[in-house]
Amino acid sequence: SDIDNQYIRDYLNFESVSSGDKGLDFYRNPQTRGAVEWFYIGITGSREVANAILKACDREGIPPSLAFALAYTESRFKSTARNVNKNGSVDRGLFQLNDRSFPQLEEQDFFNIDVSARYGMKHLNFCRRIAKDDLLAVAMYNAGVARVKNNQTPKSTLLYVSNIAKYKARLDSSFERDVVSMFDDSLFLNEKETY
């Protein structure tokens, strides 16, 4: 059919524009997407969790290893995670979205994997645009933009950022070994290329 032929033409003429992150580039390439999904399903133990995070990363331009390190640190990939803070606010779900920061969400939304991933990545992207640095962005995600900008970052946030950085580094290393090494370098040429 015409639709099938168009799909094949699109697939064979896939244009790669580097995002600057191998994980995101591999996810966006139809030839390597399955390997990325396989890798992160193995990390999370859940196809639903892995795919929700990857989709949100793609939409917001977030490096997957950063997003998965954040989700692991926040909830250990548990969509039912819940934490009551000292100030009485409640963090819920995969990305531990705070009820005061996201008042538009209903109770059940916080525990919805797709909603949590979408809002978590939108908020992380907001922090990245302000911070211009992934580790500062993660600090802002945890402690709040104002506290970090005003040099009032709590010690607990510094430990949190360190844990995310270490986990992200492990993910990046494993991704190189388990996924990137399986593919020919010619799949990813930094400028627009037709495959």
PLM regions: where:
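Short amphipathic alpha-helical segments that mediate assembly, nucleic-acid/protein binding
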Residues: D4-N5
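Catalytic glycan-binding domains that act on GlcNAc-containing polysaccharides
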Residues: I8, L12-Y195
